[in-house]
Amino acid sequence: GNSGARESTYTITIERMPLPENPVKTQISCFSWTDAIARGPEMTALRDGVRGKDKLDVPIKFIWNYAGNTIINQHSDINKTHDILQDESKCEMIVVIDNFMTSSAKYADIVLPDLMTVEQEDIIPNDYAGNMGYLIFLQPVTAPKFERKPIYWIMSEVAKRLGPDIHQKFTEGRTQAQWLQYLYAKMLEKDPQLPSYDELKKMGIYKRKDPNGHFVAYKKFRENQEANP
């Protein structure tokens, strides 16, 4: 056995978009979403691992799927999943946001086409399993094609239709480019060794080696089990 955690790594400071607290505390496992569509009110904490409640009150009626194929080809028993989704009296609305017409997107009632990373500015950090931290300043190498829009634009437009107060709370009055600069300024506050925003944009890639040489999982526990049980 193991801890169930992913392999770890050395990473450079990254600041992500702030997320409000989710008011819905009831949870199910990612894998059991088809059960929640087909027999939601029958699912209980004891039998199905429902968290935050003894049982589900209602089934899933709406799916918002962003950049993933969980709907069909990354789920088990595709034929059963297909049959569940074909009954529109169960899950009544599926929205998919993606770059391509994936297997999951074909089941959507609404498809919102997103931009690819090579079509917009962004900053991404290294992922995992390495001793070199880095930041990549993505810059568009081609213009957006057809009617595709950035995910921030899409969500801003959704927020706008929910009301001016929701739109202001979501965007905080910033464009996508302004958010990128705002978040990077917060990164600089935490990590003054980073280059300036304009310097990073010019460099394209910023690298920094792990100052400890390499990452050791549960290092404190390994060094002193009694002090770090």
Regions from the language model: what does each represent?
Residues G1-Y107, M116, I123, K209-P229:
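Extended redox/cofactor-interaction regions of prokaryotic respiratory oxidoreductases
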Residues G52, D127, Y134, P192-P195:
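Short, functionally important structural connectors and interaction interfaces within domains
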Residues K53, T70-Q74, Y128, P140-K149:
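Hydrophobic alpha-helical scaffolding
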Residues P59-W64, G130-P140:
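Short acidic (Asp/Glu) and glycine-rich catalytic loops that position anionic groups and cofactors
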Residues D87, I110-T117, E157-Q168:
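Short, well-ordered loop/turn and helix-capping segments at boundaries between secondary-structure elements
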Residues S103-F137:
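Flexible glycine/proline-rich, aromatic-decorated loop/lid segments
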Residues I136-K220:
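Long, C-terminal catalytic modules of enzymes
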